[in-house]
Each structure stands twice: as structure tokens, then as C-alpha cells.
Amino acid sequence: MVKNLSIWVISQKENKENRGSVEFQIFNFTKKIRRLTSHLKLHKKDFLSQKGLRKILGKRQRLLAYLSKKSKIRYKDLIDKLELRDTKTHQ
């Protein structure tokens, strides 16, 4: 429940800001990933959803790589807010 609450707070703040920003796009992908992950826990043989999840994961990974190259501070803040792991390639 804590993750959902923190995501809701971030989304309310981001709704007033730029929706086209990299941070907002990563936030939306993270929200979709968490929703699909919970769906796949119930429906293990839903292979189309698995494929969609892999696509979204790749898009989020590319955006995170872009953000880490552009601004390390914004990248660190975002992964802390969304409770994501920092990969070794982005350090």
C-alpha cells in the first residue's frame, strides 16, 4: 500500500507539471509495469501481456538511460521516489 500511496502523491504533483517530461513518462511506464505485474501473478499464461510488459520495460529502461546521461540529480531523485533499483550501467 505504501508504494501505491507514494505513486499517487507523485502523480498528483506531476499532473500539474509537464506531462511530456521524461520523469512523467517513466512514472507512467512504472505504473503500467506494476499493474501488468499484478495481472500476470493471477494469469500466468497470458503471453500477450508478458510481451507487452517486456516492451514497456525496454522503453522505461531507455528513458532511464537517457535521463541518467542528461541529469544525474534528476535521475537519482526519480529512482528514489519510484523505489527503483539503480543499475550498474547508469552509474
Swiss-Prot record:
Biological processes per GO annotation: translation
A single cellular component GO annotation: plastid
Keyword Amino-acid biosynthesis: no
One GO MF term attached to the UniProt entry: structural constituent of ribosome
UniProt-annotated location(s): Plastid
Residues making up the signal peptide according to the UniProt record: none
UniProt keyword Plastid present: yes
UniProt cross-references to InterPro entries, sorted A to Z: Ribosomal_uS15, Ribosomal_uS15_bac-type, uS15_NS1_RNA-bd_sf
Pfam family membership, one: Ribosomal_S15
Keyword annotations from UniProtKB, A to Z: Plastid, Ribonucleoprotein, Ribosomal protein
Assembly and interaction partners: Part of the 30S ribosomal subunit.
Sequence similarity: Belongs to the universal ribosomal protein uS15 family.
HAMAP family per the UniProt record, alphabetical: Ribosomal_uS15_B (MF_01343_B)
Record-given protein name: Small ribosomal subunit protein uS15c
Source species of the chain: Cuscuta exaltata
Gene coding for it: rps15
